[in-house]
């Protein structure tokens, strides 16, 4: 038995459908608008998310673009992954200037 695994303690199971709702709420809080499974700001796609079995697949653009954006994919397997994705996107949104929007 190690200190990492205390007896009688286990993380709650990951529920991707509930995590998707949490992610959507977090992205709306960042000022993004949801359209057809994608999240936009000023008519430019910024992020997308979809449930695939036991995983939540999320992606964000490397830079905002009206044409075909480059995506950075990230599978979300836990509530912590969802929080990290939202926090990372928040930092990225702050770094992009208005001319990139």
Predicted features, each with a name:
Residues 1-101:
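Charge-dense, helix-prone N-terminal extensions
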């Amino acid at each position: 038995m190690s200190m990492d695994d205390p007896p009688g303690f286990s993380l709650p199971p990951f529920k991707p459908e509930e995590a998707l709702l949490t992610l959507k709420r977090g992205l709306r809080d960042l000022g993004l608008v949801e359209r057809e499974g994608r999240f936009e700001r000023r008519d430019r796609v910024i992020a997308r998310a979809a449930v695939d079995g036991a995983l939540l697949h999320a992606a964000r653009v490397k830079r905002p673009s009206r044409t075909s954006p480059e995506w950075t994919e990230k599978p979300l397997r836990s509530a912590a992954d969802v929080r990290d994705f939202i926090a990372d996107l928040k930092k990225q949104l702050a770094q992009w200037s208005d001319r990139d929007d």
